[in-house]
Amino acid sequence: MRTELNQGLIDFLKASPTPFHACASLAQRLESAGYQRLDEREPWPTQSGGRYYVTRNDSSLIAIQLGRRSPLEGGLRLVGAHTDSPCLRVKPQPELNRQGFWQLGVEVYGGALLAPWFDRDLSLAGRVTFRRAGRVESQLIDFKQPIAVIPNLAIHLNREANQGWAINAQNELPPILAQVAGDERGDFRALLAEQLQREHEINADVVLDFELCFYDTQSAALIGLNQDFIAGARLDNLLSCHAGLQALLAAGDRESCVLVCTDHEEIGSCSTCGADGPFLEQVLGRLLPDGDAFVRIMQQSLLVSADNAHGVHPNYADRHDANHGPKLNAGPVIKVNSNQRYATNSETAGFFRHLCFDVEVPVQSFVVRSDMGCGSTIGPITASRLGMRTVDIGLPTFAMHSIRELAGSHDLTHLVKVLTAFYSSPLLP
């Protein structure tokens, strides 16, 4: 099971260089399992026992199984994760010519660790909107091959490089695509039109706009003498999306189960398709009874907000509270914060711990040092919007928000096991 799950994650990461591609990958796997796509612009002919999924903005997805037992009797079991990761996104008018090199201006998306982006073989992927035969259409593209690089400055020209050199995102991050003659800047939209034709055999009249990000072409891999680790881009938080999907597909059909994978978590979730937008409320509002019955269902339901946790780093162990340093390959982590940066309370933490005990999965706790700030997740946002009990959990990770992150290769099995038990649990607290 461990080998199969890890290989499935590696394949999912490779197929999902952007939130758009992640959403498409999830949708494809759901359809293969018999889930029916619902269009938000059309009526929804749903029924008990039905399995459905909905997408918004091509980058967020909600899948729901309406169980044999009514949600009014047993509530909903929800797992939440996010599809986006910190990256470098191409600006609307990106063409640059500096010293005879064609470069693209980029904007930093989210709280990225910038230094690891240098000297990587980068490709480009995302969504392109274009006009064809008088109609406006959109299509996903992925160059797949390494087409760009951000070279470091030699240490001979920057003697302070190893003494905490600050990176200027405006000047030092534009990737190099090619050498050009004279003042030529290159035509980026023409390049995108060529890619549309090459990848999809689409002859666009004109490329109107795009949402594209660079990514590292190095594939995720199992590493270490004993393959104890999995290294790859976007583990935060596609690892949780993958685990949630595997658990949903493995769960029984008695209970009503929901998988929520939203975009824009890394920048605050405030969007039409983010956790702080109306997407989940509107989908549940159309699938469930309204009014008093809806509130009753919400109060019987539970959300597991799954987002990677900070594992205790052997070189920086002092960055953790001594009693709350999660270890890789030691099971999922319950995240606690008294200032509600995480939505966990004693009842929801206790229930998750109970599930772990039942399926013999090790479980850990994380509390940030009292003299450090704490990040947050979609957990508190969803809990406050729906009034739903929530537990924040995640798998321990090193190098979070780097271009290449590291997690334990045993932990994915632990997480899928306990999430499957959660989806199948006949009782909630």
Curated annotation (Swiss-Prot):
According to its UniProt record, which cofactors does this protein need? Answer: Zn(2+)
Give the signal sequence positions. Answer: none
Lineage, uppermost ranks: Bacteria, Pseudomonadati, Pseudomonadota, Gammaproteobacteria, Pseudomonadales
Q: PANTHER family under this entry? A: ASPARTYL AMINOPEPTIDASE
What does the record list as coiled-coil region(s)?
Answer: none
Determine if Metal-binding is one of this entry's keywords.
Answer: yes
Q: Name one GO cellular component term.
A: cytoplasm
User: Nucleotide-binding as a keyword?
Assistant: no
Q: Which GO terms describe its molecular function?
A: aminopeptidase activity; metallopeptidase activity; zinc ion binding
- Under what name is this protein listed? Probable M18 family aminopeptidase 2
Q: Which family does it belong to?
A: Belongs to the peptidase M18 family.
Q: Which residues bind Zn(2+)?
A: 82, 156, 401
Return the EC number.
3.4.11.-
Q: Which UniProt keywords apply?
A: Aminopeptidase, Hydrolase, Metal-binding, Metalloprotease, Protease, Zinc
Q: Which GO terms describe its biological process?
A: proteolysis
